[in-house]
């Protein structure tokens, strides 16, 4: 279970390993696309880890990256088509970003660092753990950005009208991509403040 638990906090792929930052900028202005993106990456990382782990002993080292990319590309295409079929509106919001999962550093990093050296079940848990760790950060950032940027959560108003009547206005800055950087930086700061072993000299 360590492979599942470690990536959630101690070795979070976004805040500790600093991977997958680009999509954190792109899809976190609203909670719904952030959830879908997080779940999509989780499924793809887990399945890709299992597939690569199953065939790891038959992959020539010289072309292993190409094979890993082919596996990931096939899974991303499958997930993209499923989203278009069952969640078209979200698929449109995510647009090219689902396709860019292929180049997500988290996927290639786990395939290369873990799946190529481990059996399918630990690889599956590692994929789920890293995917959920990634999704967790996306969801946290998206919740803050949507509430303060739009006054909604999952497109449902959460700030009472009386607050607006008192003079409050939504913070448009929260909907700009750089705010995701600032929020992730705050999460990293909190993590490192709580865990001294993460601090660099």
Cite the ranges covered by each PLM segment.
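C-terminal ends of transmembrane helices
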Residues: 48-61, 108-118, 190-192
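Transmembrane alpha-helix boundary signature
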Residues: 78-93
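C-terminal transmembrane helix-loop-helix hairpin of multi-pass membrane proteins
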Residues: 2, 124-201
